[in-house]
């Protein structure tokens, strides 16, 4: 299957998962799994949230940002991310993603798959 994001539904979600500003995405949903191309403008974020019954893989395409991750029963960690990085949030783990650059969008592909 080929997913053409430019031809898919465009959604703008303010304060997504409790984050800052807006999360803009072209999303594909097959009733079980989600695949999307996301954009966070400078200062925008996807709020900290836990994955339950699914996992998420994020491929950073462009820009710079910060991911906050937390494994069960552990402290949060913060790491810088940039184009070429791949992030994995397994079932039961928590994370958030933020565009920390002063200018330039953080652009990424993500897959949220049920487990």
Predicted regions and their residues:
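A short, N-terminal "cap"/entry segment at the start of jelly-roll beta-barrel domains
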Residues: 1-34, 47
């Amino acid at each position: 299957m080929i997913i053409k994001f430019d031809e898919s539904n465009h959604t703008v979600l303010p304060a997504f998962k409790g984050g800052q500003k807006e999360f803009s995405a072209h999303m594909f949903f097959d009733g079980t799994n989600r695949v999307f191309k996301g954009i966070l403008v400078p200062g925008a974020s996807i709020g900290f949230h836990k994955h339950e019954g699914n996992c998420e893989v994020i491929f950073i395409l462009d820009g710079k940002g910060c991911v906050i991750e937390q494994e069960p029963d552990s402290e949060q960690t913060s790491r810088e991310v940039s184009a070429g990085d791949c992030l994995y949030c397994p079932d039961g783990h928590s994370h958030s993603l933020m565009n920390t650059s002063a200018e330039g969008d953080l652009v990424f592909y993500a897959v949220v798959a049920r487990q």
